[in-house]
């Protein structure tokens, strides 16, 4: 795991403390994600609103009017839309965090993909 270890740890802490079950999905509130990306929550919500087609129901739900919860897919989609340097770093760390969790449990996404025995 390369990158900003303090940011990685902040993401890990936020996920452990702020994640909750909503409508059968594990989610995090937009306000908590905004804190990690260091963007104003209104900016984050505007980004979601203006890119609604990028957030299907398995990525995001609207908790209250204009207040959102995001799954891991929504968190990753949002990170790709934000432009600040901190947001770019946080986006990379979120990806590394989620992949780290898979590897920690002995799972690799590539191991799950059927390759028909293709090798170089």
Where are each of the predicted segments found?
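An anion-engaging/catalytic patch
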Residues: 1-108
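Well-ordered alpha/beta subsegment
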Residues: 105-120
